[in-house]
Amino acid sequence: MVRLLLIFVLILSCVPKQEHPLMHNLEPSGEADFKVIELRVPEYLDTERIMYKTDKGFYYFAKNVWVCELSCVLENYFKKAQGGEEKVYLEVLDFYPVFTGKKEGYVYLRARVDRKKEYVYKIPFKVRSFEEIILKMNEAVNRLLEDVNKYVQITTSSKSISDSGLPTPP
């Protein structure tokens, strides 16, 4: 009986343990002057798995995931940053790290606001750990937040000028 128990323990100790993936999220560094009324993310990006690109194609990280689908992560990000009443429609067209070397590359973010204004960011990185990639991805979304704030301020001021009855500047 003891031998059987020892054999059973030995077999169980040889079974590979399943590693739990590390979960990541994005946190805003500023406040938004707008509310995102609709957020769109392409289906291939809208997963809990974090995508990356190399010269050979697209892949997903094995040990690192988002806390929920990418659209959920971004919606939570913009809800936390929300401060203004102006409403915008936001499309995230591309968002992933691109590796140009073994541990270097850039985070690529391409987004469109109100189906009009498009933003493209390439945030370079040289990493020692995966956390640094997430920090660069967070930096890219923070830059988008800043630029959309500027866009909202410009469109709001041009709206108020046209509403005032004054001639609009060329």
Curated annotation (Swiss-Prot):
It comes from Aquifex aeolicus (strain VF5). It comes from the Bacteria. This is Uncharacterized protein aq_1534. The lineage of its organism: Bacteria, Pseudomonadati, Aquificota, Aquificia, Aquificales.
